[in-house]
């Protein structure tokens, strides 16, 4: 009888442990995320009102949330400030390809920025950006362009540097080289018009870095 009780107890314990192993806490708060919410320095995402109420420090503003799995379940947030004008390629070097995809439809700014930062000669715009951030691709800049109005309203509340959406001569570097001339041309982007143009890599333009946040989509 003792043996049977021992075996039954052992089986119960195993089943209990198995159920614990299979239960993983999933944070489903991302379901409520939307453009205009604040990414805080502690990693939390919330409305500006909640951020201020809780005494958190805003770091970036969400401008796209991939609820449909279009870009592998990511959210994008844009920095509260511009980064200073720099060249795409070191002006003291000759022109050469820098290892980006050159794909204007790809959401690969992070990969592109890594290539620019760690290529044989580091790109000035990549070196200028905090390692936590990356320079958006053409496709990612388009997402920012589409959300610029709501993003700017929250940037203003956070005391950040507004996106220049009414300046025709204001351009930002993307991290995408031009497929037709990757050695000496890369794409610049206007948040005023949503237009992008090829530019000489030795040209000076600002960057507006972004971060990506992986959504917890397993629940």
Model-derived regions, located:
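Short, compositionally biased
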Residues: 20-130, 201-219
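Secondary-structure transition/turn motif
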Residues: 80-83, 190-194
């Amino acid at each position: 009888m003792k043996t049977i009780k021992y075996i039954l107890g052992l089986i119960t314990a195993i089943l209990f442990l198995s159920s614990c192993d299979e239960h993983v806490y999933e944070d489903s708060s991302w379901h409520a995320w939307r453009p205009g919410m604040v990414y805080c320095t502690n990693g939390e995402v919330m409305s500006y009102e909640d951020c201020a109420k809780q005494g958190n420090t805003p770091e970036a503003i969400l401008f796209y949330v991939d609820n449909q799995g279009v870009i592998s379940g990511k959210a994008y947030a844009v920095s509260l400030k511009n980064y200073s004008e720099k060249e795409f390629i070191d002006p003291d070097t000759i022109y050469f390809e820098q290892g980006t995809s050159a794909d204007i439809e790809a959401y690969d700014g992070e990969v592109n920025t890594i290539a620019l930062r760690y290529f044989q000669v580091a790109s000035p715009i990549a070196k200028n950006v905090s390692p936590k951030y990356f320079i958006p691709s053409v496709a990612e800049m388009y997402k920012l362009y589409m959300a610029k109005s709501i993003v700017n309203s929250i940037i203003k509340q956070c005391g950040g540097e507004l996106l220049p959406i009414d300046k025709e001569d204001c351009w930002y570097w993307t991290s995408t080289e031009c497929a037709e001339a990757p050695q000496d041309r890369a794409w610049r982007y206007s948040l005023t018009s949503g237009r992008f143009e090829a530019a000489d890599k030795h040209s000076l333009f600002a960057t507006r870095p972004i971060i990506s946040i992986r959504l917890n989509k397993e629940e």
